[in-house]
Design a protein with these regions (language model features):
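Histidine/acidic-residue-rich, glycine-tolerant segments that coordinate divalent metal ions
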Residues: 1-84, 94-99
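Metal-dependent amide/peptide-bond hydrolase catalytic core
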Residues: 63-241
């Protein structure tokens, strides 16, 4: 969408996302969702297999991945900040119980409360992975996907709040929601910094959780969301004359 110029002549960008019942109930809405930043890494251990009777002839990929995982758990940033690093895949070895695997694969899910913190976290993670070479193995890695954190326009959020007030009233309008989740919506403001963007948080009595296989929500919220966005756009047009 961005590369094809779909937002080149846009001043504002308004999005919407349902929120779980722990955050918002039906007929409640938040003036913005402050998503965190996220990154996903795939890593590989390169080596030669060895026989179980001759472990000195190879480097055990399982040991290397274990060392990396321990190193990741010893990354400490500012305690006031929200961040996390989790190993989500670890594969090494095969069906033969007497073979020490020289090759392995691992994946990481990395999250931080903002883009600056994510960049700092990425550097620390890369240092941990590269340090594993001290065991004598070769490692490689690639960041396969990055989702930027929210860059919310205060002006856009003010208009969103006015739209919520028109539909739900003061008592059903909440302030910003901060979440460790991420969303592709925020690529727009990274690629086009002049865009004034904000995402509406919409209550739907959604449970047990977002993206859960048995997720359920009250579908009546959909038209509420449409009306809030309509009122928000009308407020912008009124302001611009």
């Amino acid at each position: 969408m961005v590369e094809k110029g779909a937002v080149d002549d846009a001043d504002f960008l308004f999005g919407v996302h349902l929120r779980p019942i722990e955050e918002l109930s039906l007929k409640q809405a938040a003036s913005s969702i402050r998503h965190g930043a996220a990154g996903f890494l795939e890593g590989t251990i390169h080596g030669e297999d060895a026989h179980g009777a001759r472990p000195h002839q190879g480097i055990n990929a399982i040991d290397v991945i274990s060392m990396i995982n321990i190193g990741l758990k010893n990354i400490w940033l500012r305690p006031q900040s929200s961040y996390s690093v989790k190993m989500t895949r670890c594969q090494a070895g095969g069906d033969n119980l007497n073979i020490i695997p020289g090759n392995g694969h691992f994946s990481l899910d990395v999250r931080a409360e903002n883009n600056t913190l994510l960049e700092e976290l990425k550097k620390r993670i890369e240092h941990v992975i590269e340090s594993a070479a001290s065991m004598g193995s070769k490692t490689s890695y690639e960041w396969i996907d990055l989702a930027p954190g929210a860059e919310v326009s205060e002006e856009a959020e003010r208009f969103m709040r006015k739209g919520i007030l028109e539909v739900y009233g003061e008592d059903k309008c909440t302030g910003p929601l901060y979440t460790t989740g991420s969303d592709d919506f925020h690529y727009y403001t990274v690629k086009r910094p002049y865009l004034k963007a904000v995402m509406l948080g919409l209550g739907a009595d959604l449970q047990p959780g977002l993206h859960h296989p048995y997720m359920k929500f009250d579908h009546s919220c959909i038209m509420d969301g449409v009306e809030i966005l309509k009122q928000t756009v009308l407020k912008v047009l009124e302001d611009r004359g």
